[in-house]
Amino acid sequence: MRELTKRQSEIYNYIKQVVQTKGYPPSVREIGEAVGLASSFTVHGHLSRLEEKGYIEGDPTKPRAIEIVSDQTNDNINMEETIHVPVIGKVTAGVPITAVENIEEYFPLPEHLTSTHNSDIFILNVVGDSMIEAGILDGDKVIVRSQTIAENGDIIVAMTEEDEATVKRFYKEKNRYRLQPENSTMEPIYLDNVAVIGKVIGLYREM
């Protein structure tokens, strides 16, 4: 492989370090902060040079899609397989949840955090503390499997009457549905009809 400049070595070593500790690569912003580069354009330039020199491989259509190229100098890196899961920024009635217009970004998840077909998985960023007693905190990412049915007690993502996604525990009662927050200070939501979007199957939290 071709020799790296000092800055390229800093970036390359930082990427390796993050992959070793987290199992997935850092974002361009994180790389810039780590090596003291304010411009994402400059970081992209260094990443392009690293790719040209055969140290990394990238996918320009996906953020964080950086792979360390295995060779004699780094074949001891323990890279966990990752999948790039769509992060849903909004949910629109009548539009498939993973429609392009709903996707804010793609987030790399260690593959062991999912247990189903990757195409059925999406992520929602949790806002608020309505599920704190279930261990779901503000700022967490919930891993969701797309489905339109649920069983009593499931933690689901549902569409509210205001066309917003909400994470609650699902209960079907005699003549209505109850969406129960896991926060003893909050009241349940009662609905005549409920649009189930998916079931929460996992949680990701950055420490």
From Swiss-Prot:
Catalysis performed (reactions): Hydrolysis of Ala-|-Gly bond in repressor LexA
One Pfam family this sequence matches: LexA_DNA_bind
Site description Cleavage, residues in chain: A93, G94
Annotated keywords: Autocatalytic cleavage, DNA damage, DNA repair, DNA replication, DNA-binding, Hydrolase, Repressor, SOS response, Transcription, Transcription regulation
InterPro entries: ArsR-like_HTH (IPR011991), LexA (IPR006200), LexA-like (IPR039418), LexA/Signal_pep-like_sf (IPR036286), LexA_DNA-bd_dom (IPR006199), LexA_repressor (IPR050077), Peptidase_S24_LexA (IPR006197), Peptidase_S24_S26A/B/C (IPR015927)
Domain of life where this protein originates: Bacteria
DNA-binding region of this protein: 28-48
Stretches of the chain forming a coiled coil according to its record: none
Function: Represses a number of genes involved in the response to DNA damage (SOS response), including recA and lexA. In the presence of single-stranded DNA, RecA interacts with LexA causing an autocatalytic cleavage which disrupts the DNA-binding part of LexA, leading to derepression of the SOS regulon and eventually DNA repair.
Subunit-level organization: Homodimer.
Protein name as catalogued: LexA repressor
Source organism (scientific name): Staphylococcus aureus (strain Newman)
